[in-house]
Amino acid sequence: MMFIYVVALVSAVAFTDAFPTGAPVSACFDMIPGHGTDPKPPPAPYTIGAVANSVKAGKSVEVVISGKTPEDTMLGILLEARQGDKIVGTWNVAPDDDFAQLLDCGAPGNAVTHKHVPNKQPKQTVSYVWNAPADGEGDVTFLVTIVKKYDTFWVKVSSAPIQIVHAH
């Protein structure tokens, strides 16, 4: 009887790690959703990029994620800015955003993920504002995991790097 209880508990925990309420903190480093299936191989049918190729330290830049065709929509994301393996900066997400919310991946608001909305409609394009660290410098790459549907997702889709420059 105890074995059945343990199996049920483990199954429930595994299932709850793949909620539609956003990526769990456990996905912050590897950016792999707990969906029990392998990611799709690159190239992904999505693009990610900043609207500028540089940003001043302490300032902001918009980052846009888009499907390449109208059929390339998103139900979920996990978005981060990285220098190497380090997550840097913070994000702005409007409180009334119907798709995303902030996630704390080791620091407040340093990642963006989807949120639960009843009858959520897939998005073809989303954009969020990234705030460069005030003491930042060097190249930053934006990485996003995109979920088209539960068993169809791409991990760490990468932008071209942008440079953080010191404000004078």
Swiss-Prot record:
Name the record gives this protein: Putative defense protein 1
Subcellular localization(s) per the UniProt record: Secreted
CDD domains tied to this protein: Reeler
Keyword line: Antibiotic, Antimicrobial, Disulfide bond, Immunity, Innate immunity, Secreted, Signal
InterPro entries recorded: Ferric-chelate_Red/DefProt, Reeler_dom, Reeler_sf
Cross-referenced Gene3D superfamilies: Reeler domain
GO terms for biological process, alphabetical: defense response to bacterium; defense response to protozoan; innate immune response
Cellular component GO terms held in the UniProt record: extracellular region; membrane
Family listed: Belongs to the insect defense protein family.
Ranges of residues in domain Reelin: 19-168
Organism: Lonomia obliqua (Moth)
